[in-house]
Amino acid sequence: MVAHNPKRLTWTLAACALIACSSGESAKAGAGDRDSSGSGGGDRTLVVFNAGSLALPLRAALDSFAAREGVTVQQENAGSLETARKLTELGKIPDLVAVADYEVIPLLLIPEHATWYAKFAHNRMVLAYGDRSRGAAEINTGNWWQVVTRPGVQVGRADPSLDPNGYRTLLVWQLAERFYKQPGLAQRMLASAPARNVRPKEADLVGMLQAGEFDYIWSYESIAQGTGLKYVTLPEEIDLSSASDSAAYAVASTRIAGKTPRDSVTMRGQPIVYAFTVPTRAPHAALAAKFAAYLASGDGRRVLRGAKLDVLERYLVVGSGAPPSL
């Protein structure tokens, strides 16, 4: 199926502005590079590092939490791998880390920087496009792979070394090749999305698609919905959304950098699951625990859902040392 633009244009424009400012530094609720919400002194500042695809949902949750608690909040958006490496390589320690692939936390942060994580949301890979995109009038769930591999079609994708969306894109291509029984399809998709079309994170691609620089971008359904983009849904066998297809997803794999530049690890296809943690050296651990509890509360989940995130009914905590409220 093909999803169309939502009616709430004002909300969509605000969402696009926030996505556009997701530069890997701090984000405002609408524009700019740094944000503070709520009131209170510096000792009541909650700092959150999160995946670019969580920019909108966590912005909404942070604003709600700040209003309730009378605290200041700061948000930094980047690819999940880049987010984790802010701790491991730059020594920047936030109060809470939220990533688009739960595996990033045990892979890069445990045990040195964290001891637990909470799985809290799902997503699915989609192919987003605009009215001016080549093939926009005819693309659908059945023919998308033929449209994006046509000569001249330009496809944007995220950097697999910085963002899970980037390596998930490569996995989707492999799964599509098997699903459609088209040998060489993954390589043809790569030709339509060469290195010059790679950006640090999937959120960076939205503005370029809207400006007509790309015909299509690989994204998440939550981002496409949150920014009002049209998109093509993919079969569950390849969109990394279905728990029942876990074994089939796992046949696809790619390698990315590990804890050090010299290390590499294999990432296999699996259902998309988001997670968050409070670092062991979080400057405001008690406040972070309170925010984590808010994210898991009924009110917190409603706010996240309102920002188009598919949150779990019950969060799954892995590891030890998590706040009792989770």
Protein language model annotation of sequence segments:
Residues 122-123, 271:
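Short, solvent-exposed loop/turn segments at the edges of secondary structure
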Residues 10-20:
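Bacterial N-terminal signal peptides
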Residues 22-90, 101, 109-110, 131-326:
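Exported/periplasmic ABC-transporter solute-binding proteins
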Residues 47, 119-120:
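Short acidic-hydrophobic sequence patches enriched in Asp/Glu that either
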